[in-house]
Amino acid sequence: MSRHLFTSESVSEGHPDKIADQISDAVLDAILAKDPKARVACETYVKTGMVLVGGEISTKAWVDVEDLARQTVKDIGYRHSDMGFDGASCAVLNAIGKQSGDINQGVDRANPEEQGAGDQGLMFGYASNETSVLMPAPITYAHRVMQRQSEVRNNGTLDWLRPDAKSQLTFVYENGKPVAIDTVVLSTQHREDITQETLREAVMEEIIKPVLPEQWVSKDTQFHINPTGRFVVGGPMGDCGLTGRKIIVDTYGGMARHGGGAFSGKDPSKVDRSAAYAARYVAKNLVAAGLAERCELQISYAIGVAEPTSISIDTFGTSKHSEEQLIALVRRHFDLRPYGLIKMLDLERPIYKQTAAYGHFGRDNLPWEQTDKAADLQADI
């Protein structure tokens, strides 16, 4: 019997890097709502009392970047100076310019179907049948713990919690399947007057126990709740935040490889984002079709070129079909040119801010999470 441990982490919506991601995607969504063909590469930096929004944007639309940044910070929960950050009073600096014409000439074409990739790069998509959402268990439950922290903070159950938090879960795998949770780490920002005893009991009862499946938790499971003790100073006062610094949290928690490109703040002409979504869509449908228990798909592109420069598939010995058979199947059923995948997933619309916290994958309301191709794939193999 093969037995090993695997660990993934997540962070809350109030983590500094996630504040930056959400502001970048708030700007993107506001622009796409008015101009679906806009070219957006929006980067954000946050630190005590300051938000800096920069990047390259080409659009016919006007949006109030300052108001979008402030509202995003307030929606996350930073509304008072005693939290170290206040959306109403922080400085917002705007350093946005236009997209380079050199890039634009490689993307836009007279025939839209010949739209070139916005950059070179390699992207990965992954799926596994170990959870109902066809995602790895460690990242799935690390996200759910963080979502529960946000829920009890906002609904008043634990109103002394603050927005900044992190989780980390270590799972025991036997023969490639999760069988138990070995370790849970949860650190959450809190109000200054809360004792560690009160915090640890409340976090265990209100956050951890309601989320983790009972069959995976035992007397051997270790829990580390705020293991350093006091966590009052957090958010941008504790650390600066930057768009695109949580790419493993955003994807598969380290279970799959990553091409290196971040997602937030980028319109769908940027294959860093759109092709990673398409790769997840393909991998998930292959697993949903029963053609593999695990599947990792890699796609690569050249700037200005429509067709992918490569497609490869690894099923880790869980498929009865060869890589060549599966790639041929993918080519028949999925158009992975930039124009094709944007059309296939209907990506030129304001759907991105919701992805900027708690992961871009494993959420059934998103187009790249649908398994509508599974039956056709199964019938055609």
Curated annotation (Swiss-Prot):
Its cofactor is Mg(2+); K(+). One of its GO terms (biological process) is one-carbon metabolic process. Gene3D superfamilies: 3.30.300.10. Its main location: cytoplasm. Pathway: Amino-acid biosynthesis; S-adenosyl-L-methionine biosynthesis; S-adenosyl-L-methionine from L-methionine: step 1/1. It catalyses: L-methionine + ATP + H2O = S-adenosyl-L-methionine + phosphate + diphosphate. GO terms for molecular function: ATP binding; magnesium ion binding; methionine adenosyltransferase activity. It comes from the Bacteria. It is found in: Cytoplasm. L-methionine binds at E56, Q99, D239, K270. Mg(2+) binds at D17. ATP binds at H15, D164, A165, K166, R230, F231, D239, R245, K246, A262, K266. K(+) binds at E43. One of its GO terms (cellular component) is cytoplasm. Binds 2 divalent ions per subunit. Binds 1 potassium ion per subunit. Homotetramer; dimer of dimers. Catalyzes the formation of S-adenosylmethionine (AdoMet) from methionine and ATP. The overall synthetic reaction is composed of two sequential steps, AdoMet formation and the subsequent tripolyphosphate hydrolysis which occurs prior to release of AdoMet from the enzyme. Belongs to the AdoMet synthase family. PANTHER family: S-ADENOSYLMETHIONINE SYNTHETASE. HAMAP family: S_AdoMet_synth1 (MF_00086). This is S-adenosylmethionine synthase. The gene is metK.
